[in-house]
C-alpha cells in the first residue's frame, strides 16, 4: 500500500543524499556519514505520516531467558534481526572475525539493556541495546583502548534517553551522534598513523 510506496521513495531519496554526504565528508576529511541519510529521511517520514508514539509497551518480568534474549537482540537489531537465535549467529560471525569486536557489541547491548531497566523503558526487544552496541563497534576501530568505545556507549544511551524525553523515534540517531562525538575526540585511525 501507501506505506510501501513511502518506504520505496525514502530509500530512493536516501541514495543521492548518502552519495553527496559521503563525497563532501571525504573531500573535507570530515566525519563519516554513517546512517545520517537514513536518520534524516526516516525522521521526516515518521513525523509526516502521523504523530509518533514512543510510549513503552508492557515490560516483561526480567527472568534469565528474557534477559539473555534481550541482550542478544540488542546486537541483532543492528541488522534488523528480531530472533535471538539469528542474533546469536550474527554475534558468532562477528566473533569469528574479531573476538574484541564481539565483546564490545555485547558490552554495548548490555549497557543499553541496563539503562532501559534503570529508566523503566522497554528493553525486551533489543531496541535499547543496538545504539550503544553500534557506537562501541564503530569506536573500537580507532586506537585509544577502552575509553573511546565506553564514551560512545554512554553517549548513545544518553542521547537515546533524550530522544525518549522529546518523544522522537531514536532510529540510529544515538549511535550517529555518539560516534561522531567519539571520533571528534579520537586518536588518529590506525591506517592514518605513520
Where is each model-derived feature located?
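Transmembrane alpha-helical segments in integral membrane proteins
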Residues: 88-100
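C-terminal transmembrane helix-loop-helix hairpin of multi-pass membrane proteins
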Residues: 1-47, 61-86, 100-194
Amino acid at each position: 500500500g501507501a506505506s510501501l510506496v513511502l518506504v520505496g521513495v525514502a530509500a530512493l531519496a536516501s541514495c543521492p543524499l548518502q552519495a553527496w554526504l559521503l563525497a563532501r565528508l571525504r573531500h573535507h576529511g570530515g566525519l563519516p556519514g554513517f546512517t545520517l541519510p537514513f536518520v534524516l529521511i526516516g525522521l521526516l517520514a515518521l513525523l509526516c505520516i502521523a504523530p509518533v508514539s514512543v510510549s513503552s509497551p508492557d515490560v516483561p518480568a526480567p527472568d534469565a531467558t528474557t534477559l539473555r534474549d534481550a541482550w542478544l537482540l540488542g546486537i541483532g537489531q543492528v541488522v534488523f534481526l528480531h530472533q535471538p537465535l539469528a542474533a546469536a549467529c550474527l554475534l558468532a560471525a562477528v566473533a569469528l572475525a574479531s573476538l574484541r569486536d564481539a565483546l564490545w557489541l555485547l558490552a554495548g547491548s548490555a549497557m543499553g539493556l541496563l539503562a532501559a531497566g534503570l529508566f523503566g523503558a522497554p528493553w525486551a526487544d533489543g531496541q535499547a541495546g543496538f545504539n550503544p552496541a553500534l557506537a562501541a563497534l564503530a569506536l573500537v576501530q580507532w586506537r585509544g583502548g577502552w575509553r573511546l568505545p565506553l564514551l560512545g556507549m554512554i553517549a548513545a544511551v544518553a542521547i537515546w534517553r533524550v530522544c525518549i524525553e522529546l518523544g522522537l523515534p531514536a532510529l540510529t540517531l544515538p549511535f550517529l551522534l555518539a560516534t561522531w562525538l567519539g571520533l571528534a575526540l579520537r586518536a588518529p585511525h590506525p591506517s592514518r598513523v605513520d
